[in-house]
Amino acid sequence: MSSPSSLPTADVLVLGPHPDDSEIANAGTLLLLQRAGQRVVLLDVTRGEKGSRGTAAERAAEAAAAAQQLGVLARGNLGLPDTGVRVDDHATDLLVGAMRAVRPTLLLGPHAQDVHPDHTAVAQLAERAWFLAGLRNYQPQLGAPHRPRVFLRYPGNRPIEPTLVVDITAVADQKAAVVRCFRSQLNPPDRAHLVLGLDVAERALVRDQFYGARIGVRAGEPFWHDGPLPVRDVAPLLG
């Protein structure tokens, strides 16, 4: 597990509130990006230590296994308190430093529409850090300014109306294997604490089927972008 400031440069930076959030939402897209030669770095914001299942050490081991299975370049952690993420200068500067170290073209972060307060806070934190990271005179000691050109948001515990849906049918089985690395979050004997009554693997499967059906495929991952995305070549839209 790398510290945020020592993360390597990459094409894609994925911000997850807790270990497993990035994989549940994005593993298929990340597998496809890497097939296309894109370098991916994962950055968890907390260690998930306040969750109902799994210790911080167990979840760290699961996150490392998932990262290896996914084949990403590196995985880091901001070390902010689980259930206590705040959008303050300290957290902002940690994330600004990470963005300037990784220097991604694409940033993936959680959508603010969520029942978990950490997800909402991380969404707001990402928005703030994304902007400030590009300012030349903001905390220059954190590195040269850099603002990811594309910033996509992914859903957590609530559905979103997506701007785009990525067809992940070709890698759906690989994604399922990655998500199953989070063994402490699978098949709990008591489901009363689960927001939607589903464990992480079940939630990923059902959501991918739902959004996949919306574009006529077996599995899809949804993303939201603030404003229209430019399309310079219409031909790929024809299939």
Question: What are these regions, as identified by a protein language model?
Answer:
Residues 1-102, 224, 234-239:
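Active-site rim/loop-helix segments in enzyme catalytic domains that contact anionic ligands
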Residues 1-15, 87-239:
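Metal-dependent de-N-acetylase/amidase catalytic core
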